């Protein structure tokens, strides 16, 4: 419900025998729909022949029974759901990306955001390479293919490509004979794998996706690790594993991931409950009821209620048939959707002092409208509490906040923000508090650069989402 936009979810499956894998991928993607609702797609490998389909829209609308039939059988398949953080919302930017090269074919699905995609793409274009999309995923594909021409195996090519691509990426790669999963050396985005009772190996962005297809969770893929699934079993390549400290994006726990997922050993639901408990201790207020913003604020609201002793109530009802507000790129569209997405429970909040819990405030537009809804429903006070610190820095690793321009916390004090959104008071989770919601030690931790400005990698210049479109348009105008 917050105004944050994340990017994608990936899914891959390797089967020892040929079968209708697209049906399994469909269910896997359906359980990852929360990670991206702009477009989706599936690619299937049938004895080295790749079939694929992708389009704009939700999984249920794009991957129809007729599409599943046309994709046919195979023993390897990959799938993707997208919200773009580099490149616009065009069909050409939908994934998986399927490419043919002199040594065969490759399909790639990627979750994350490169910080050097512009530089790499410029190098490729200077050498005559042609790009068909404006996504950084195609930059990854070009890099792997260039390395593949020199390497003996696809996994060697991926390993060498990881020396060149910088930033956040969790990806699945399909070659004629193998399924490969790879995670960047910081582990910004989650990736895990499991195994079904039928012997299929399944890779997914979140463990909830494994559950949906009946796969038993085996483990998370480590930061910097490459895992290869093939006819000879599983191979792990850890050449890049010890290069950096793990810095998983903390918003995976706060917002992005489904509460029934386990990421890097931590249950997402428990992390959100704990965030709410800490928030209550750090930002107490006298009130009658605690209300969470559906769906992302509900678990933290339960934690706040538990720690404060203030009753929890369902004060806002979500229309489940309206997509997440952040999926609609234009601000006006997002604001219009809020009107029909949430409805206050007047009988619950009328005459009450309400504590409203959400996971973040980025621009403030959505928060202000929700506060207004509660007041119109009869709430006599609305105290907003946020289960994350103020968002004051751009994210370069997969959240669609590429500039400080629209970050309300960069422009106003907490008291001023409270006034702008119409809340009686406003409180945020502290930096120390957010570090306590998961496992943090000398070897692993969170990326909280959007809160404290300490980036785990070299700080890039601010990169705008549609930079490749702008470059193309500039070339056309010459």
What does each model-identified segment do?
Residues 1-223, 228-288, 293, 381:
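Conserved short alpha-helical segments that host acidic/polar catalytic motifs at enzyme active sites
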Residues 85-86, 116, 180, 188-189, ...:
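Flexible loop/turn segments at secondary-structure boundaries
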Residues 109, 174, 182-183, 194, ...:
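Generic beta-strand/beta-sheet core signal
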Residues 133, 138-141, 312-323, 420-438:
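A conserved beta-strand->alpha-helix junction
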Residues 160, 208-209, 216-217, 221-225, ...:
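Phosphate/diphosphate-binding loops
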């Amino acid at each position: 419900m917050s105004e944050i936009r994340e990017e994608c979810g990936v899914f891959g499956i390797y089967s020892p025998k040929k079968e209708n894998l697209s049906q399994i991928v469909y269910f896997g993607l359906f359980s990852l729909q929360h990670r991206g609702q702009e477009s989706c797609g599936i690619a299937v490998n049938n004895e080295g022949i790749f079939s694929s389909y992708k389009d704009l829209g939700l999984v249920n609308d794009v991957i129809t029974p007729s599409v599943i039939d046309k994709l046919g059988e195979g023993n390897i398949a990959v799938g993707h759901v997208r919200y773009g953080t580099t490149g616009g919302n065009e069909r050409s930017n939908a994934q998986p990306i399927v490419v043919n090269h002199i040594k065969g074919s490759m399909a790639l699905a990627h979750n994350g955001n490169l910080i050097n995609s512009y530089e790499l793409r410029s190098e490729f274009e200077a050498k005559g390479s042609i790009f068909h999309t404006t996504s950084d995923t195609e930059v990854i594909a070009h890099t792997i293919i260039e390395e593949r021409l020199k390497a003996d195996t696809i996994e060697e090519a991926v390993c060498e490509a990881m020396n060149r691509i910088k930033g956040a990426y969790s990806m699945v790669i399909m070659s004629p004979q193998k399924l490969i999963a790879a995670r960047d050396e910081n582990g910004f985005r989650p990736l895990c794998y499991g195994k079904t009772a039928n012997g299929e190996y399944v890779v997914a962005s979140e463990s909830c996706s494994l559950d949906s297809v009946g796969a038993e969770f085996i483990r998370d893929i480590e930061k910097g690790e490459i895992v290869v699934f093939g006819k000879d079993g599983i191979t792990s390549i850890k050449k890049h594993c010890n290069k950096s400290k793990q810095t998983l994006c903390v918003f995976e726990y706060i917002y992005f991931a489904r509460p029934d997922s386990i990421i890097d050993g931590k249950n997402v639901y428990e992390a959100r409950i704990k965030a709410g408990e800490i928030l209550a201790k750090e930002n107490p207020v006298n009130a009658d009821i605690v209300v969470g913003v559906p769906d992302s604020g509900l678990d933290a609201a339960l934690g706040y209620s538990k720690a404060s002793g203030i009753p929890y109530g369902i004060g806002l009802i979500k229309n489940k048939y309206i997509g997440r507000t952040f999926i609609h790129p234009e601000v006006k569209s997002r604001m219009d959707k809020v009107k029909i997405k949430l409805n206050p429970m007047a009988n619950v909040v009328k005459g009450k002092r309400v504590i409203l819990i959400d996971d973040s405030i980025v621009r403030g537009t959505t928060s202000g409208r929700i506060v207004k809804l509660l007041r119109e429903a009869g709430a006599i006070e609305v105290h907003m509490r946020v289960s994350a610190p103020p968002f004051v820095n751009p994210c370069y690793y997969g959240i669609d906040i590429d500039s400080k321009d629209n970050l309300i916390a960069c422009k106003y004090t907490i008291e001023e923000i409270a006034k702008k959104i119409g809340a009686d008071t406003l409180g945020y989770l502290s930096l120390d508090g957010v570090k306590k919601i998961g496992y943090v030690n000398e070897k692993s931790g969170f990326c909280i650069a959007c809160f404290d400005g300490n980036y785990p990698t070299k700080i890039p210049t601010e990169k705008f989402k549609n930079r490749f479109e702008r470059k193309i348009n500039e070339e056309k105008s010459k």
